[in-house]
Amino acid sequence: MNRSSNVPRKGILKSGTRSLQKVRRVHFANARNARSLLSMLKDISAQIIQRAWLSHTNKMIFRLLKHAICAAEFYVTHEILKKVAPLEAKLIKDPTMQCKIRFRFRGETFPPFIVFKIFLHTDGHGYKYFSGKNVLMPSSKAVDDACKLMGERKFHRIIMEDERIFPKSKVTDIMDVVTMQDYVQYRSFFDEAPAFSGGRNNSWRKLNLENIPRTMLMYDIVHYSESGVISNRLRNEMKFLLQRPVTQEIHKHQLRIVSEIRGPYLTVQPLYRPYKQQNQVKFLGRRSKQAQMKVEKMRKVYLAKEKNTSEVTEPKTGPSGTKDNYHLHSIF
């Protein structure tokens, strides 16, 4: 009777332990899934915050670069060109030359870099560019004379250069122009081609950081976009420059701030130095422990010698407190 009654109890205990183990496994699996889900949500949240912050900083940098490019085009064109090409700056300053310099953004990645190009206004009359490629016809005697003067090697090198350029740009001559798009491509090729091959050599040129005067806030803006390091001068003006210009006067004032020439910050030092006692003087440089001990011994020896010399030179005093001097003794 007792044996038969113990059998189902053992089966119940075994089934109970198995069910508890299954419950624990399910609980642990759910806990692991919850932890992995929580970590995944944290990563997604961090990525969202990073993207939002990067987009905010990119918009801020682009707005500052827009101020810099507008200030360069309307206020400090001559100062910048004087650093890039002094001869071209002198030519553009001539009132008879109706030139205009345009600044634009260029680049495949952010932040973009600034480029500039010189445009010549002709009021619809146009200018004639003389080059040997356009003037000398292939079947003329002038070509034979040019070959004799230049030499066959140099002459053939120029011809091979034209053949090399043609596959890159199909429109390299006025005879290749058929449509308006071909004419635009020909003008672009004519501007970018070097002068020795018959072009204008007037392409878009990159404006480097060295070409911008350091005394302008424009230099700090370009340096901040390239390196990510902001200067104190730019930080002080950042709040006003990032404001949306409601009126034209506010926009002009922002451009004046960017293009304003400011002197470097000077730290005024006193003309004299206050006297320092010997124990307050700090020795510059680094010394080893052995050198310090050697200096300390030498100092003690020097002080001891100085003390002995002072005792020898100083006259002795008698018991009455008067100095013993044989010149003052009375002879009886």
Curated annotation (Swiss-Prot):
Residues 306-332 are annotated as: Disordered. It comes from the Eukaryota. This is Uncharacterized protein CXorf58.
